[in-house]
Design a protein with these regions (language model features):
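N-terminal pre-domain segments of enzymes
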Residues: 26-58, 402-434, 516-519, 532-553, ...
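Bacterial N-terminal signal peptides that target proteins for export
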Residues: 1-15
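Repeat-blade elements of multi-bladed beta-propeller folds
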Residues: 42-45, 83-102, 106, 132-161, ...
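Bacterial N-terminal signal peptides
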Residues: 11-25
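Extracytoplasmic/lumenal domain signature
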Residues: 63-76, 107-131, 147-149, 162-199, ...
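Segments forming glycine/polar-rich beta-alpha architectures that bind adenosine-containing cofactors
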Residues: 454-455, 459-493, 498-500
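Mature N-terminal segment immediately following signal peptide/propeptide cleavage
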Residues: 30-78, 89-92, 576-577
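Alpha-helix-centered segments that form part of catalytic cores
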Residues: 448-455, 462-467, 562-575
């Protein structure tokens, strides 16, 4: 292999090209646009509409069990230390895969048949990346072609730079921006418009840019907001750039400025002293209508909003804007005055449905709160009524909750939205049920997904129990032919508690934590682990809970609700659902994942037959849909009788939910699966990793191909 170092200013670009791999047949860029119809996977979500759907059906329910590992690619050497949270979904264009990996967020091009490295690229951004709010390898790359041989791979670095590379060899597209780079920190602000520092300013993104026609659209994200030092954080924004030149085309402010619609929903001019409210997940686009759909996150901070009275538009809203101008067309706010971290965490799904004989161009948004919100994507009108209903009110000093919240009437919730004491408490045995009820006396248990956080105390009430997380960042999938959405959901409830922060830590009155417990700063996944980041000191362990109580909820406010080491609620703990959008009805729902080992082998359950429980963490694994099956991997490692310890990649019949196949993986799924075809052979690729297993891409195919292991630097 040959190596070239390109000096491009402050960051250093490294491109490694496998010369032997540059074969004309593999890298020829023929006229025509990539499409799943041609066996490609040209977008993170397969298409611009977010469906994660491919019409390929060589691999199906009758042969899924026969899949073998065709090749594998370890990402250990794409950075100075291995990555254990590989979340990428590769793109497949004419037999070449493009994706990110490693702690330096390197871009790699791989031969789709063998996994052999064609080229790699990375930027060495130093401190700027080391302190970035969204670290590790991100979710992948984007692709653009003019159909005439100008083919580009586009990604956002850890340090928030937009970079374009020539798809053929990984070299920088020097005509884009400045020598191939647009500095996305330029234009980001906090306060009333103060520019952030280009090195230390807090902003980034780990999702892929939306690329449509000659426009590339990029969102923004800040550090996770459970225990942050200030509410006056960097403000979220969405921007569109000319894909050829890098010229800024438009900006949409997710926290409206004075004179912009929605500014008055930040009472007491609180727009000027609050931040976040970015679009950190995938953006979807209707190219024909010229409309862009922006799923907006929570403002600073996640669980306390006393410093931002009002409904806080466009926080936790779906916003539709014009592709050419960025002008708002319509919006719908899912949560008024957000306090539950119910940010819109995944791509809106664009489907053409038929309701009562009426054709509707729809947008469907799965959510953390287990509702699919469905709208006419042209007008923003809900397809079925969404009702404003009274919700519990906060008793936290300084907090002012919205008196009502939107409740969709259809489709029904596809996951557990709160803990119902009358039917949800663990009941494997009468003894465990009684212990569960006793433990819950230490919590405020509401019958609403909108039970607000409360001040928690180790010696009193530990927290308020509400919804956990249904669908998270990997997002759901949809079949554009049958109009069915396939949505995953975690089913464990969450406890949320607040505490005054230690002196000097934050200007926010209350942050996540418990009075009487050692304060712990909450770090997001991967925070501290960028290529050049120094290791953070280990936080002190929390003290044990009071005798007889359930364990203390973590500082982030989620989980921790157990009895004798078992979840405090009845199974299933993770589910996969099919939702018919023509009818607004649940077609089927099944547990996802084998029963965890700690439940299957628990001494208090000895001799009992435990039905398949599904797995916690299902909200954090993605899925894909093909002509006949839904494919999704396990979020946990298990070792049931009859197979070695590991996780399974599973296929479900689309019509019934019956599992029709499963293949073994050495680690849990950590990204989202995709599929493509090369020379008439279909492959499925999924990212795996976690725990002690570093990130790896696994490629599966039917028998007939060889198995090969590649790793950059090996």
């Amino acid at each position: 292999m040959s190596r070239r170092f390109l000096r491009i200013g402050p960051p250093i670009a490294l491109v490694i090209i496998g010369l032997a791999s540059l074969t004309p047949g593999l890298l020829s860029q023929n006229t025509g646009l990539p499409s799943t119809r041609n066996g490609d996977w040209p977008h993170y979500t397969a298409d611009l509409k977010g469906t994660r759907y491919s019409p390929l059906d060589q691999i199906n329910g009758t042969n899924f069990n026969q899949l073998e590992v065709a090749w594998r690619f370890k990402t250990d050497n794409l950075g100075p230390r291995p990555e254990y949270k590989l979340e990428g979904t590769p793109l497949a264009i004419k037999g070449v895969l493009y994706t990110t990996g490693g702690t330096r967020r390197s871009v790699v091009a791989l031969d789709g048949k063998t996994g052999e490295v064609i080229w790699t690229h990375s930027l060495r951004e130093g401190r700027r990346a080391a302190i970035a709010p969204r670290q590790l390898s991100g979710r992948g790359v984007s692709y653009w072609t003019d159909g005439k041989g100008d083919d580009r791979v586009i990604y956002v670095t850890t340090g928030y730079r937009l970079v374009e590379l020539h798809a053929k060899n990984g070299a920088m597209v020097t005509s884009f921006g400045k020598d191939g780079i647009v500095d996305l920190k330029v234009g980001a602000v906090k306060g009333k418009g103060e520019a952030i520092d280009l090195e230390t300013g807090e902003i980034g993104v780990h999702s892929t840019a939306a690329v449509v026609k000659d426009i590339v659209i990029v969102g923004s994200s800040m550090r996770e907001g459970a225990t942050v030092p200030t509410h006056n954080n960097t403000k979220g924004l969405v921007r569109a750039f000319d894909v050829r030149t890098g010229k800024l085309l438009w900006t949409f402010n997710t926290i409206p400025k004075p004179g912009e619609f929605g500014n008055d929903t930040w009472e007491n001019e609180s727009w000027a002293v609050n931040g976040n409210t970015g679009v950190w997940t995938q953006i979807t686009v209707d190219e024909d209508l010229g409309l862009v759909y922006l799923p907006v996150e929570t403002p600073t901070s996640d669980y306390y909003g006393g410093h931002r009275p009002g409904n806080n538009l466009f926080a936790e809203s779906l916003v539709c804007v014009d592709l050419k101008t960025g002008q708002r067309k319509w919006y719908f706010q899912f949560v008024h005055h957000p306090l539950w971290n119910f940010d819109n965490s995944s791509a809106p799904l664009l489907l053409d449905i038929n309701v009562n004989g009426k054709a509707i161009k729809a947008v469907a948004s799965p959510s953390k709160q287990a509702w699919v919100y469905v709208f006419d994507r042209v007008t923003g009108q809900p397809v079925w009524p969404i009702e404003e209903r009274p919700v519990p009110q906060s008793d936290v000093p300084g907090e002012k909750t919205s008196p009502t919240q939107p409740f969709p009437t259809k489709p029904p919730a596809y996951g557990r939205q709160y803990l119902d004491i009358t039917k949800d408490v663990i009941d494997f045995t009468p003894e465990l049920h009684a212990q569960g009820l006793e433990a819950l006396k230490r919590y405020r248990v509401g019958n609403s997904p909108f039970t607000p956080p409360m001040l928690g105390d180790v010696n009193g009430i530990l927290g308020a129990i509400g919804a956990g997380t249904a669908t998270n960042w990997p997002g759901s999938a949809a079949d554009p032919e049958t109009h069915v959405v396939y949505a995953q959901a975690g089913n464990l409830p969450s406890a949320r508690s607040l505490v005054a922060p230690p002196a000097g830590f934050s200007d926010i009155r209350y942050v996540s934590g418990l009075a009487g417990q050692q304060f712990r700063e909450v770090l997001g996944p991967g925070d501290c682990c960028a290529a050049d980041a120094p290791p953070r000191p280990t936080a002190p362990a929390a003290p044990p809970p009071p005798s007889g109580a359930a364990p203390n909820p973590p500082a982030a406010g989620g989980g921790g609700l157990t009895v004798q080491g078992l979840p405090i609620v009845r199974p299933p703990y993770g589910v996969l659902s099919a939702i018919d959008l023509d009818k607004g009805e649940l077609m089927w729902q099944v547990p996802h994942g084998d029963t965890p080992d700690n439940i299957r082998t628990h001494p208090m359950l000895a001799g009992m037959t435990i039905p398949k429980t599904g797995q916690a963490g299902t909200s954090g694994v993605g899925l894909m849909v093909t002509k006949t099956v839904v494919v999704m991997g396990d979020p946990q490692i298990t070792a049931p009788p009859g197979r070695q310890r590991g996780a399974m990649l599973r296929a479900y019949d689309k019509k019934t939910g019956q599992q029709v196949g499963a293949v073994w993986m050495p680690a849990p799924q950590s990204g989202s699966p995709m599929t493509y075809s090369v020379d008439g052979k279909q492959y499925i690729i999924v990212a795996i990793g976690g725990g002690a297993y570093s990130g790896e891409y696994l490629a599966f195919s039917l028998p007939g191909g060889g198995t090969r292991t590649t790793s950059q630097g090996q």
